[in-house]
Amino acid sequence: MKDDVLKRQAHTAIQKKLGYAFRDMSLLRRALTHRSHHAKHNERFEFVGDSILNYTVARMLFDAFPKLTEGELSRLRASLVNEGVLAEMAAEMNVGDGLYLGAGELKSSGFRRPSILADAMEAMFAAVSFDADFNTAEKVVRHLFAERVRRADFQNQAKDGKTALQEALQARRFALPKYRIEEQIGHADDSMFVISCDLGELGFVCRAKGTSRKAAEQEAAKEALKWLEEKLPLKKKKK
């Protein structure tokens, strides 16, 4: 009984942060239900929410940065729409307090797991569209991402770690890096990946962890780039 009251309070607070009040609360509850808790979980909602999120942020960037190319806009969107940003946003909204998790996830602090929080955010965008319509869901995304888009700095954020490393190696005329899965820990839906980044002829290999293969590769690439720029800095051209 006490848990139900706390969940309702959490859901009320989450709606205030979203800037949207649900008419059908079952949709919000579904969006916050992890597969470990119930057969009616949020994974199908994530599928729709991901599309709403990507379209809306893409349109926001398209309007805000009229001079950027398609590739530049894609990289900038990747810096804003990713597990890390969504998990950070969910933490700011205390989404973890409103999640429905199975016993195993509760014991392992799943309410703080970035992948679970990020998935819940996407699922909530879908829930809003089902409760109202696409335009309302788009308004919610715009509300949440407005400040992040306003602060977006293409020069510093647009290039993800792998792209930046690739360009740095090409500028020095070295071969592209090779990424390899060294270890995968945990279950299929909530794994921790250990990825190695091998710079080949340079003789440097580093490892990094992430809640997805993509996230781990990005972290490994950033570590390799840091090493490369320290060991082989490019000479600045004389004016």
UniProtKB/Swiss-Prot annotation:
SMART domains named in the record: DSRM, RIBOc
Residues covered by the RNase III domain: 11-133
Any Gene Ontology biological process: regulation of gene expression
Enzyme Commission (EC) number: 3.1.26.3
Listed Gene3D superfamilies: 3.30.160.20, Ribonuclease III domain (1.10.1520.10)
Keyword rRNA processing: yes
Cited NCBIfam families: RNaseIII
Function of the molecule: Digests double-stranded RNA. Involved in the processing of primary rRNA transcript to yield the immediate precursors to the large and small rRNAs (23S and 16S). Processes some mRNAs, and tRNAs when they are encoded in the rRNA operon. Processes pre-crRNA and tracrRNA of type II CRISPR loci if present in the organism.
Protein name: Ribonuclease 3
Originating organism: Neisseria gonorrhoeae (strain ATCC 700825 / FA 1090)
Taxonomy of the source species: Bacteria, Pseudomonadati, Pseudomonadota, Betaproteobacteria, Neisseriales
